[in-house]
Amino acid sequence: MYFPGEGLVLAAGKVLTGHPWYGILSVSALMCAAICWMLQAWLPPSWALLGGFLAVLRIGLFSCWVNSYHTAGSIAALGGALVLGAVPRLRKHPQLRYAMLLALGAGLLAISRPYEGLLLCLPVAAALGHWLWARKNRPPAGALLRLSAAPVALIFTLGAWMGYYDYRAFGSPFTPPYVVDRETYATAPYFVWQSPRPEPAYRHVVMRRFYEENELAAWKRIQTGFLPQTLMKAAAGILFFSGIALLPPLLMLHRVLRDRRVRFLIVCLAVLSAGMAVQIFIVAHYLSPFTAAFYALGLQAMRHLRLMRFDGRPVGLGWVRLTVTICLVLGGVRLFASPLHLQIPQWPASEWNSQWYGPIEFGKERARVAATLERLPGKQLVIVRYSADHNPLDEWVYNAPDIDRSKVIWAREMDAADNLELILYYRERNVWLIEPDTRPVEVVPYPDSRALKCAGQKSPSTPALNYHANRAALAPTSAAVAPLAQAP
C-alpha cells in the first residue's frame, strides 16, 4: 500500500548486502548527516553539530525508523532536510548543486510521504517564488534557466517513473497504491470532513478489526472531540522528537516565535500543523519531512535558554548542559538495557515513547519461530491461526518479495476450501500450524495436511471433505516435528 521509496531502500539493502535492514541503516545514517547539513544553513556550526548528534541519539539508533522495515520516516526526513538545507544556500549562492539537492529532496518526499511532503514544499515554493520575482538580487533569466533545467528534468523524470510504476501495478498512472488500499479495505476516511465508506467484504477477521476497531474508532474520536484529539496529536509528535529531556528549551518558545532567523521554519511547521489537524490519523513518520525543522527550532530555543540569567547567574547554561547530559544518559541506558537487566516499557503502556527506544515486543517471537523453520530441511508453509481477540497490530503474516521461491511462506488460516487450495498449490512443502496467541508458541504439523493433499489430488473439484477423520493416522512430515512441537 505504500509508495515505492520504502521498497527501493529495502531492495537496495537486499541486493547490495544480502539483508534489507542494511538499506534502512544506510538511509538512517544519511538522514542524520543531512539534518546536520541542514542545520548548518540556519544555525552556527557548533549548534548544528549538536543537533545532528541529538538526532542520532533520539531517532538514529533505537527508534522505529531504524529498527523496523517501515522506512518512510528516514527517507522523508532525509528528503525534508535536503529541501530545507538547500533553500537558504540557494538564495545566498544560486548554484546548480543546491538546486539539484532541493530537487532530490523533493523527489524523496514524493516517493515516501507525498502528502506531508507537499505540505513542506508549499511554503518552500512560495519562498523561492518571492525570491525570484520580488527581490532585487534575483539571478538573470539566462542564469535562472541554466540553474533550473536539470532539477526540473529530474523531477519530471521521477514523476514519469512513478506514473509508470503505478500503471504497471494498478493499470493507471494516476492511481497510487495507497488509494487502491484505502478503496479496497478502509472504511474510515482520511480527512475530518469526509464520511466513512460502507464496510467491504473482509476475508479475515483480523483485517476487519484493524480497519473497523482501530481506524474507524480514531475517526469517531475526532468527530466528538476535535480540539483534545488535535492537542494529543501535537503532544505525541513533540514527544517523539524531543522526549522529556528536551522539553525545557520549550520554555523559550515565546522568544523563538519572534526570532527572525527561524521565521521561515516556523511558517513551515504552521503549515504542517494545519495539515495534521484535518487528518484523522497520525504516526511519527507522518511528521518526518519536518524533522530537521523540529530540531532547528529546538536548538534555537536552547540557544535562547543558554542566555537566560537569574539573579545575575547563568542558570540557562546549566539547563542546556543538563538537557544534553540527560539525553546521553538515556541513550546509554537504552544501549545497555539488556546486560543491566532493565525492564523497558512495552506496548501498549507506552505506545508513542516506544517508537524512539524500540523495538517493541511485536515480531520477536515470530523471528524466533522463523529462524527455527529456516533450519528445517525442505520448504515450509506456515498457516497462522489468530485468536478472536488477537491484536491486529501484531501481524505474523508477511513474506519475502519472491514468495514462491521462499524457504518459508506464511499465510493466514481461511475456510476449508481456501485452505485446501493453498495446500495443494504448495503441495511440495511441509505444512505447519502456528497460533501466535498461545503461550508458549508452538509449531505443530497442520491437522490432516497430508490427507488434504491426497484428497485434493483425487478430487480437486470437491474441496469440502471431512479431512479430520484421518488425523490419527497422520505421521510427522519430518524428523524435526517432535522437537518443534516441544519448543518453548
What do these predicted ranges mean?
Residues 104, 121-125, 148-156, 265-266, ...:
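Signature aromatic-anchored transmembrane alpha helix within multi-pass, membrane-resident enzymes
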Residues 72-75, 109-112, 118-119, 171, ...:
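Hydrophobic/aromatic-rich transmembrane helices and adjacent perimembrane loops
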